[in-house]
From Swiss-Prot:
The active site is at residue 10. CDD domains: proteasome_beta_archeal. It comes from Methanosarcina thermophila. This is Proteasome subunit beta. It is found in: Cytoplasm. The keyword Protein transport does not apply. The lineage of its organism: Archaea, Methanobacteriati, Methanobacteriota, Stenosarchaea group, Methanomicrobia.
Amino acid sequence: MDNDKYLKGTTTVGVVCTDGIVLASEQRATMGHFIASKTAKKVYQIDDLVGMTTAGSVGDAQQLVRLVSVESQLYKMRRDESMTIKGITTLMSNFLSRNRYYPMMVQLLIGGVDKNGPGIYSLDAMGGSIEETRISATGSGSPMAYGVLEDQYRENMTVKEGLDLAIRAIHNATKRDSASGENIDVVVITKEAFKRLDPEEVKSRRALLN
């Protein structure tokens, strides 16, 4: 089966910092060569201090967000503590693996801060997961994003530095990937809070890159 018509373009990135993590995406949604939306949401909050980025089929991604959010809340109610990032990733991995013969066309980043510190995991449509110790990118614009991330990431970055790096990586990807574009959505997660940056602040930071 030719899956090309089911695949949707996107660029999302994740950056691991000393005091938290940064998740970011652009906001263009496409159907083939048609721009279906310029305000698509691709970074979701799935627990108090855990977020997820989605690339691929919008419907599949939204179903997975609902699933993992509910399971995370049920776990918290039963055990009076939050699931770890690895635990949430394992839950998602098992669900994707069970559906391998009817795969959900998604590529995900799950990241946040738990009792073990900041962390990010990447998952593919078959449920394969990799712990990312520094940087990660998904979607059709990821090759361009990785060029920036690999070149400018350094050890011991703070989230303030990491968010500028994430914005730069997405910004550069939108220049060459026609399926990525429009505004940039940025989330910063520290041990204190899950914070989605104001769009005007992101625009101001992005303007400095031109």
